[in-house]
Design a protein with these regions (language model features):
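Juxtamembrane intracellular "pre-TM" segments in multi-pass secondary transporters
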Residues: 2-5, 191-224, 248
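Extracytoplasmic gate region of multi-pass secondary transporters
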Residues: 30-31, 218-272, 329-332, 336, ...
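Helix-breaking motifs and short loop linkers at transmembrane-helix boundaries and internal kinks
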Residues: 42, 74, 95-101, 112, ...
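Conserved MFS/SLC helix-loop-helix module at the cytosolic interface between two early adjacent transmembrane helices
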Residues: 61-97
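Structural signature of the two symmetry-related core transmembrane helices
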Residues: 77-91, 290-305
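Cytoplasmic helix-loop-helix junction between adjacent transmembrane helices
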Residues: 105-145
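Helix-loop-helix hairpin linking two adjacent transmembrane segments in secondary transporters
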Residues: 140-187
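A membrane-interface helix-boundary motif in multi-pass transporters
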Residues: 160-173, 252-255, 289-292, 373-392
Protein backbone atom coordinates (compact mmCIF):
# COMPACT_ATOMS: atom_id res chain seq x y z
CA UNK A 1 0.00 0.00 0.00
CA UNK A 2 1.07 3.57 -0.56
CA UNK A 3 1.29 5.40 2.70
CA UNK A 4 0.74 8.75 0.96
CA UNK A 5 -2.74 7.87 -0.32
CA UNK A 6 -5.55 9.66 1.56
CA UNK A 7 -7.20 6.39 2.59
CA UNK A 8 -4.05 4.94 4.14
CA UNK A 9 -4.39 6.72 7.51
CA UNK A 10 -8.03 5.65 7.76
CA UNK A 11 -7.19 2.01 7.06
CA UNK A 12 -4.46 2.04 9.68
CA UNK A 13 -6.81 3.70 12.17
CA UNK A 14 -9.41 0.96 11.58
CA UNK A 15 -6.90 -1.83 12.23
CA UNK A 16 -5.44 -0.19 15.34
CA UNK A 17 -8.91 0.62 16.70
CA UNK A 18 -10.00 -2.98 16.18
CA UNK A 19 -7.00 -4.25 18.11
CA UNK A 20 -7.64 -1.69 20.84
CA UNK A 21 -11.21 -2.99 21.10
CA UNK A 22 -9.88 -6.51 21.63
CA UNK A 23 -7.45 -5.13 24.23
CA UNK A 24 -10.28 -3.73 26.36
CA UNK A 25 -12.46 -6.79 25.82
CA UNK A 26 -9.72 -8.97 27.31
CA UNK A 27 -9.10 -6.49 30.11
CA UNK A 28 -12.70 -6.32 31.33
CA UNK A 29 -13.51 -9.99 30.86
CA UNK A 30 -12.52 -10.69 34.46
CA UNK A 31 -15.20 -8.37 35.85
CA UNK A 32 -17.89 -10.30 33.96
CA UNK A 33 -16.94 -13.64 35.54
CA UNK A 34 -16.06 -12.63 39.12
CA UNK A 35 -19.01 -14.47 40.64
CA UNK A 36 -18.33 -17.94 39.15
CA UNK A 37 -14.58 -17.56 39.81
CA UNK A 38 -15.30 -16.63 43.42
CA UNK A 39 -17.57 -19.65 43.84
CA UNK A 40 -15.26 -22.21 42.21
CA UNK A 41 -11.95 -21.03 43.67
CA UNK A 42 -13.53 -19.96 46.99
CA UNK A 43 -12.02 -16.49 47.05
CA UNK A 44 -12.76 -13.46 49.20
CA UNK A 45 -13.65 -10.08 47.71
CA UNK A 46 -10.19 -8.79 48.59
CA UNK A 47 -8.61 -11.68 46.67
CA UNK A 48 -10.83 -10.93 43.67
CA UNK A 49 -9.70 -7.32 43.77
CA UNK A 50 -6.10 -8.51 44.03
CA UNK A 51 -6.35 -10.34 40.68
CA UNK A 52 -7.09 -7.05 38.93
CA UNK A 53 -4.50 -5.17 40.96
CA UNK A 54 -1.76 -7.65 40.04
CA UNK A 55 -2.69 -7.27 36.37
CA UNK A 56 -2.06 -3.56 36.84
CA UNK A 57 1.40 -4.26 38.27
CA UNK A 58 2.32 -6.08 35.07
CA UNK A 59 0.77 -3.34 32.98
CA UNK A 60 2.28 -0.24 34.47
CA UNK A 61 5.70 -1.57 35.51
CA UNK A 62 6.57 -2.48 31.92
CA UNK A 63 5.01 0.59 30.29
CA UNK A 64 8.10 2.81 30.85
CA UNK A 65 10.24 0.21 29.08
CA UNK A 66 7.92 0.15 26.08
CA UNK A 67 7.64 3.93 26.14
CA UNK A 68 11.43 4.24 25.94
CA UNK A 69 11.59 1.72 23.08
CA UNK A 70 8.55 3.17 21.32
CA UNK A 71 10.29 6.52 20.79
CA UNK A 72 13.40 4.84 19.37
CA UNK A 73 12.78 1.54 17.54
CA UNK A 74 10.27 0.08 15.05
CA UNK A 75 6.83 0.25 16.61
CA UNK A 76 5.17 -2.45 14.51
CA UNK A 77 7.21 -5.31 16.01
CA UNK A 78 6.69 -4.09 19.57
CA UNK A 79 2.94 -3.70 19.12
CA UNK A 80 2.52 -7.08 17.39
CA UNK A 81 4.45 -8.81 20.17
CA UNK A 82 2.23 -7.10 22.73
CA UNK A 83 -0.98 -8.31 21.06
CA UNK A 84 0.37 -11.87 20.89
CA UNK A 85 1.47 -11.92 24.55
CA UNK A 86 -1.76 -10.52 26.02
CA UNK A 87 -3.83 -12.94 23.93
CA UNK A 88 -1.72 -15.87 25.13
CA UNK A 89 -2.20 -14.75 28.74
CA UNK A 90 -5.97 -14.52 28.25
CA UNK A 91 -6.08 -17.97 26.67
CA UNK A 92 -4.08 -19.56 29.49
CA UNK A 93 -6.31 -17.91 32.12
CA UNK A 94 -8.97 -20.38 31.08
CA UNK A 95 -6.81 -23.34 32.12
CA UNK A 96 -6.01 -22.40 35.73
CA UNK A 97 -7.16 -24.15 38.88
CA UNK A 98 -5.66 -21.89 41.56
CA UNK A 99 -5.48 -18.19 42.42
CA UNK A 100 -1.70 -17.97 41.92
CA UNK A 101 -1.84 -19.28 38.36
CA UNK A 102 -4.69 -16.92 37.45
CA UNK A 103 -2.72 -13.96 38.82
CA UNK A 104 0.37 -15.04 36.84
CA UNK A 105 -1.48 -15.10 33.52
CA UNK A 106 -3.30 -11.83 34.22
CA UNK A 107 0.11 -10.24 34.84
CA UNK A 108 1.19 -11.64 31.45
CA UNK A 109 -1.85 -9.96 29.91
CA UNK A 110 -0.65 -6.74 31.52
CA UNK A 111 2.79 -7.08 29.91
CA UNK A 112 1.27 -7.40 26.43
CA UNK A 113 -1.25 -4.63 26.86
CA UNK A 114 1.48 -2.29 28.11
CA UNK A 115 3.26 -2.54 24.76
CA UNK A 116 0.14 -1.86 22.72
CA UNK A 117 -1.30 0.80 25.03
CA UNK A 118 1.95 2.75 25.24
CA UNK A 119 2.96 2.77 21.59
CA UNK A 120 -0.19 2.67 19.45
CA UNK A 121 -1.60 6.13 20.44
CA UNK A 122 1.55 7.83 19.13
CA UNK A 123 1.21 5.81 15.93
CA UNK A 124 -2.35 7.13 15.53
CA UNK A 125 -1.18 10.69 16.25
CA UNK A 126 1.41 10.42 13.46
CA UNK A 127 -1.30 9.47 10.95
CA UNK A 128 -3.29 12.72 11.21
CA UNK A 129 -2.49 16.46 11.35
CA UNK A 130 -3.25 18.48 14.46
CA UNK A 131 -6.64 19.75 13.25
CA UNK A 132 -7.91 16.16 12.81
CA UNK A 133 -5.92 14.39 15.50
CA UNK A 134 -8.33 14.67 18.44
CA UNK A 135 -11.17 13.25 16.35
CA UNK A 136 -8.98 10.33 15.24
CA UNK A 137 -7.84 9.66 18.80
CA UNK A 138 -11.47 9.80 19.99
CA UNK A 139 -12.35 7.13 17.41
CA UNK A 140 -9.35 5.03 18.48
CA UNK A 141 -10.48 5.21 22.10
CA UNK A 142 -14.05 4.22 21.25
CA UNK A 143 -12.55 0.80 21.92
CA UNK A 144 -12.64 1.52 25.66
CA UNK A 145 -16.44 1.50 26.06
CA UNK A 146 -17.18 -0.81 23.13
CA UNK A 147 -14.48 -3.37 23.91
CA UNK A 148 -15.20 -3.22 27.63
CA UNK A 149 -18.91 -3.69 26.95
CA UNK A 150 -18.21 -6.72 24.79
CA UNK A 151 -16.11 -8.08 27.63
CA UNK A 152 -19.01 -7.74 30.08
CA UNK A 153 -21.75 -8.94 27.72
CA UNK A 154 -19.97 -11.80 25.99
CA UNK A 155 -18.03 -12.85 29.08
CA UNK A 156 -21.12 -13.15 31.26
CA UNK A 157 -23.14 -14.87 28.51
CA UNK A 158 -20.42 -17.43 27.70
CA UNK A 159 -19.75 -18.06 31.39
CA UNK A 160 -23.44 -18.65 32.11
CA UNK A 161 -23.69 -21.27 29.38
CA UNK A 162 -20.27 -22.91 29.19
CA UNK A 163 -18.44 -21.83 32.36
CA UNK A 164 -16.06 -18.99 33.10
CA UNK A 165 -13.05 -20.80 31.60
CA UNK A 166 -14.71 -20.83 28.17
CA UNK A 167 -14.98 -17.03 28.28
CA UNK A 168 -11.18 -16.69 28.51
CA UNK A 169 -10.64 -19.28 25.77
CA UNK A 170 -13.11 -17.52 23.47
CA UNK A 171 -11.38 -14.17 23.97
CA UNK A 172 -7.79 -15.42 23.66
CA UNK A 173 -7.71 -17.05 20.24
CA UNK A 174 -8.66 -14.03 18.04
CA UNK A 175 -5.73 -11.93 19.24
CA UNK A 176 -3.22 -14.63 18.35
CA UNK A 177 -4.44 -14.36 14.75
CA UNK A 178 -5.05 -10.60 14.58
CA UNK A 179 -1.51 -9.78 15.70
CA UNK A 180 -0.38 -10.61 12.17
CA UNK A 181 -2.55 -7.82 10.72
CA UNK A 182 -0.01 -5.33 11.99
CA UNK A 183 2.56 -6.60 9.53
CA UNK A 184 0.32 -5.40 6.68
CA UNK A 185 0.68 -1.81 7.92
CA UNK A 186 3.51 0.60 7.27
CA UNK A 187 4.62 2.86 10.07
CA UNK A 188 4.39 6.60 9.51
CA UNK A 189 7.63 8.38 10.43
CA UNK A 190 7.53 9.89 13.91
CA UNK A 191 6.16 13.40 13.63
CA UNK A 192 5.20 12.87 9.97
CA UNK A 193 2.03 14.96 10.16
CA UNK A 194 3.73 17.63 12.26
CA UNK A 195 5.88 18.56 9.26
CA UNK A 196 2.73 19.38 7.34
CA UNK A 197 1.74 22.05 9.86
CA UNK A 198 5.23 23.35 10.45
CA UNK A 199 5.65 21.91 13.92
CA UNK A 200 9.14 21.30 15.24
CA UNK A 201 10.29 17.77 15.93
CA UNK A 202 12.25 17.23 19.11
CA UNK A 203 14.63 14.42 19.88
CA UNK A 204 13.87 12.71 23.20
CA UNK A 205 16.39 13.17 26.00
CA UNK A 206 18.90 10.37 26.25
CA UNK A 207 18.30 7.35 28.48
CA UNK A 208 15.72 7.38 31.22
CA UNK A 209 16.03 11.17 31.67
CA UNK A 210 13.06 11.45 29.33
CA UNK A 211 10.70 10.61 32.20
CA UNK A 212 12.20 13.26 34.46
CA UNK A 213 11.87 15.72 31.59
CA UNK A 214 8.09 15.21 31.55
CA UNK A 215 7.83 17.14 34.83
CA UNK A 216 8.98 20.25 32.96
CA UNK A 217 5.61 20.43 31.21
CA UNK A 218 3.05 21.72 33.78
CA UNK A 219 0.00 21.10 31.62
CA UNK A 220 1.06 17.49 31.16
CA UNK A 221 1.46 17.13 34.94
CA UNK A 222 -2.02 18.56 35.61
CA UNK A 223 -3.58 16.33 32.96
CA UNK A 224 -2.00 13.26 34.56
CA UNK A 225 -2.91 14.29 38.13
CA UNK A 226 -6.59 14.53 37.23
CA UNK A 227 -6.38 11.37 35.16
CA UNK A 228 -4.92 9.43 38.11
CA UNK A 229 -7.91 10.32 40.30
CA UNK A 230 -10.41 9.63 37.51
CA UNK A 231 -8.80 6.24 36.81
CA UNK A 232 -8.89 5.39 40.52
CA UNK A 233 -12.66 5.87 40.41
CA UNK A 234 -13.11 4.15 37.05
CA UNK A 235 -11.06 1.10 38.07
CA UNK A 236 -13.21 0.39 41.10
CA UNK A 237 -16.37 1.20 39.17
CA UNK A 238 -15.53 -1.09 36.24
CA UNK A 239 -14.70 -4.12 38.37
CA UNK A 240 -17.40 -3.88 41.01
CA UNK A 241 -20.45 -2.31 39.32
CA UNK A 242 -21.87 -5.57 37.87
CA UNK A 243 -21.30 -7.34 41.20
CA UNK A 244 -22.94 -4.37 42.97
CA UNK A 245 -26.07 -4.85 40.85
CA UNK A 246 -25.99 -8.58 41.60
CA UNK A 247 -25.60 -8.28 45.38
CA UNK A 248 -27.38 -5.07 46.29
CA UNK A 249 -30.22 -5.11 43.77
CA UNK A 250 -30.40 -8.91 43.34
CA UNK A 251 -29.96 -9.04 39.57
CA UNK A 252 -28.62 -12.31 38.14
CA UNK A 253 -24.93 -12.01 37.31
CA UNK A 254 -25.59 -12.64 33.59
CA UNK A 255 -28.36 -10.02 33.62
CA UNK A 256 -26.14 -7.57 35.53
CA UNK A 257 -23.26 -8.10 33.11
CA UNK A 258 -25.56 -7.70 30.11
CA UNK A 259 -27.14 -4.50 31.47
CA UNK A 260 -23.81 -2.98 32.41
CA UNK A 261 -22.27 -3.95 29.08
CA UNK A 262 -25.14 -2.64 26.96
CA UNK A 263 -25.24 0.61 28.93
CA UNK A 264 -21.50 0.95 28.57
CA UNK A 265 -21.44 0.42 24.81
CA UNK A 266 -24.25 2.91 24.17
CA UNK A 267 -23.25 5.64 26.61
CA UNK A 268 -19.53 5.17 26.08
CA UNK A 269 -19.73 5.21 22.30
CA UNK A 270 -21.95 8.30 22.18
CA UNK A 271 -20.01 10.11 24.91
CA UNK A 272 -16.57 9.39 23.46
CA UNK A 273 -17.60 10.72 20.06
CA UNK A 274 -19.57 13.64 21.50
CA UNK A 275 -16.80 14.61 23.90
CA UNK A 276 -14.15 14.33 21.21
CA UNK A 277 -15.92 16.33 18.52
CA UNK A 278 -17.31 18.92 20.95
CA UNK A 279 -13.87 19.41 22.49
CA UNK A 280 -12.32 19.88 19.03
CA UNK A 281 -14.87 22.56 18.12
CA UNK A 282 -14.54 24.25 21.53
CA UNK A 283 -10.75 24.12 21.33
CA UNK A 284 -10.73 25.83 17.92
CA UNK A 285 -12.85 28.69 19.26
CA UNK A 286 -11.31 29.23 22.69
CA UNK A 287 -8.07 27.26 23.01
CA UNK A 288 -9.33 25.74 26.28
CA UNK A 289 -11.93 23.28 24.98
CA UNK A 290 -9.98 20.13 25.80
CA UNK A 291 -9.37 21.24 29.39
CA UNK A 292 -12.98 22.32 29.91
CA UNK A 293 -14.37 18.98 28.75
CA UNK A 294 -12.11 17.17 31.22
CA UNK A 295 -13.16 19.40 34.12
CA UNK A 296 -16.87 19.15 33.38
CA UNK A 297 -16.64 15.39 32.92
CA UNK A 298 -15.39 14.75 36.45
CA UNK A 299 -17.46 17.52 38.04
CA UNK A 300 -20.68 16.01 36.71
CA UNK A 301 -19.76 12.34 37.12
CA UNK A 302 -19.18 12.65 40.88
CA UNK A 303 -22.83 13.32 41.87
CA UNK A 304 -24.11 10.79 39.33
CA UNK A 305 -21.86 8.10 40.82
CA UNK A 306 -22.99 9.01 44.34
CA UNK A 307 -26.65 8.58 43.40
CA UNK A 308 -25.90 5.31 41.56
CA UNK A 309 -24.44 3.67 44.66
CA UNK A 310 -26.69 5.36 47.24
CA UNK A 311 -30.09 4.76 45.63
CA UNK A 312 -32.26 2.07 47.18
CA UNK A 313 -34.39 1.83 44.05
CA UNK A 314 -33.00 -0.31 41.21
CA UNK A 315 -34.37 1.91 38.44
CA UNK A 316 -32.79 5.05 39.89
CA UNK A 317 -29.51 3.21 40.41
CA UNK A 318 -29.47 1.96 36.81
CA UNK A 319 -30.25 5.40 35.38
CA UNK A 320 -27.54 7.02 37.51
CA UNK A 321 -25.01 4.33 36.53
CA UNK A 322 -25.72 5.00 32.85
CA UNK A 323 -25.42 8.76 33.42
CA UNK A 324 -22.10 8.31 35.23
CA UNK A 325 -20.76 6.17 32.39
CA UNK A 326 -21.80 8.75 29.80
CA UNK A 327 -20.25 11.65 31.67
CA UNK A 328 -16.95 9.96 32.49
CA UNK A 329 -16.38 8.92 28.86
CA UNK A 330 -16.74 12.50 27.62
CA UNK A 331 -13.10 12.94 28.64
CA UNK A 332 -11.67 9.98 26.70
CA UNK A 333 -10.56 11.74 23.52
CA UNK A 334 -9.43 15.07 24.99
CA UNK A 335 -7.38 13.56 27.82
CA UNK A 336 -5.38 11.36 25.46
CA UNK A 337 -4.96 14.18 22.96
CA UNK A 338 -3.56 16.44 25.69
CA UNK A 339 -1.15 13.73 26.84
CA UNK A 340 0.31 13.64 23.32
CA UNK A 341 0.16 17.38 22.54
CA UNK A 342 1.55 18.84 25.77
CA UNK A 343 5.01 17.34 25.09
CA UNK A 344 7.38 17.42 22.08
CA UNK A 345 6.76 14.96 19.25
CA UNK A 346 9.84 12.90 20.08
CA UNK A 347 8.52 12.20 23.58
CA UNK A 348 5.02 10.98 22.73
CA UNK A 349 5.50 7.29 23.50
CA UNK A 350 7.32 8.24 26.70
CA UNK A 351 4.50 10.64 27.64
CA UNK A 352 1.94 7.88 27.10
CA UNK A 353 4.10 5.49 29.13
CA UNK A 354 4.33 8.06 31.92
CA UNK A 355 0.56 8.37 31.84
CA UNK A 356 0.02 4.61 31.95
CA UNK A 357 2.49 4.20 34.81
CA UNK A 358 0.96 7.05 36.83
CA UNK A 359 -2.73 6.31 36.40
CA UNK A 360 -2.25 2.68 37.33
CA UNK A 361 0.45 3.01 39.99
CA UNK A 362 -1.56 5.66 41.84
CA UNK A 363 -5.03 4.92 40.41
CA UNK A 364 -6.75 1.66 39.59
CA UNK A 365 -4.00 -0.52 41.02
CA UNK A 366 -5.50 0.23 44.43
CA UNK A 367 -9.21 0.96 43.98
CA UNK A 368 -10.49 -2.56 43.12
CA UNK A 369 -8.64 -4.04 46.08
CA UNK A 370 -9.61 -1.18 48.42
CA UNK A 371 -13.31 -1.54 47.59
CA UNK A 372 -13.02 -5.32 48.07
CA UNK A 373 -11.19 -4.88 51.38
CA UNK A 374 -13.78 -2.43 52.72
CA UNK A 375 -16.59 -4.67 51.49
CA UNK A 376 -15.13 -7.61 53.45
CA UNK A 377 -14.47 -5.44 56.52
CA UNK A 378 -17.88 -3.76 56.60
CA UNK A 379 -19.87 -6.57 55.03
CA UNK A 380 -21.37 -3.97 52.71
CA UNK A 381 -20.25 -3.51 49.08
CA UNK A 382 -22.65 -0.60 48.63
CA UNK A 383 -21.09 1.38 51.47
CA UNK A 384 -17.56 0.60 50.28
CA UNK A 385 -18.25 1.85 46.75
CA UNK A 386 -20.08 4.93 48.03
CA UNK A 387 -17.17 6.04 50.20
CA UNK A 388 -14.39 5.49 47.67
CA UNK A 389 -15.44 6.25 44.12
CA UNK A 390 -17.32 9.62 44.06
CA UNK A 391 -14.64 11.22 46.25
CA UNK A 392 -11.92 10.33 43.77
CA UNK A 393 -13.88 12.10 41.04
CA UNK A 394 -13.98 15.29 43.10
CA UNK A 395 -10.17 15.17 43.32
CA UNK A 396 -10.00 14.68 39.55
CA UNK A 397 -12.25 17.69 38.98
CA UNK A 398 -9.98 19.84 41.17
CA UNK A 399 -6.88 19.16 39.06
CA UNK A 400 -8.69 19.57 35.76
CA UNK A 401 -10.25 22.88 36.83
CA UNK A 402 -6.70 23.95 37.67
CA UNK A 403 -5.72 22.85 34.15
CA UNK A 404 -8.38 25.15 32.68
CA UNK A 405 -6.94 28.13 34.57
CA UNK A 406 -3.36 27.22 33.64
CA UNK A 407 -4.28 26.83 29.97
CA UNK A 408 -6.03 30.20 29.94
CA UNK A 409 -2.94 31.82 31.43
CA UNK A 410 -0.63 30.18 28.89
CA UNK A 411 -2.87 31.19 26.00
CA UNK A 412 -2.98 34.77 27.23
CA UNK A 413 0.80 34.83 27.56
CA UNK A 414 1.22 33.44 24.04
CA UNK A 415 -1.15 36.11 22.69
CA UNK A 416 0.77 38.86 24.49
CA UNK A 417 -2.12 39.78 26.79
CA UNK A 418 -0.82 41.24 30.09
CA UNK A 419 -1.88 39.48 33.29
CA UNK A 420 -4.33 41.45 35.43
Amino acid sequence: MNQNKPLWPIGSLIVLTGLNLLDYLDRQLLAAVLTPIKDELRLSDEQLGTIQSEFMWGYFLTSPIFGYLGDRVARRWLVAAGVFVWSLGTLMSGHVSALGALIFYRVLVGFGEASFGTISPGWVADLFPANRRNNAISIFYLAIPVGSAFGYIIGSAVAARYGWRAAFLWAGYPGLLLAFLLFLLKEPPRGATEQAVGALKAEPPGGWRVYRELFNYPRYVLVIAGYVAQTFALGGFALWAPTFLYRVHHMGYEEAGRYFGLSLVVTGLVATLAGGFAATAWQRRTGTGYAWVLALSSLLTAPAAFVAFAAADLTISKIALAAAMFLIFLATGPVNTLILETVPVGMRASAMAGSIFSIHMFGDLWSPRLVGYLSDRWGDLQKAALWVLPGALVVSAFFWCWLVLWTKRENARAAGVPRS
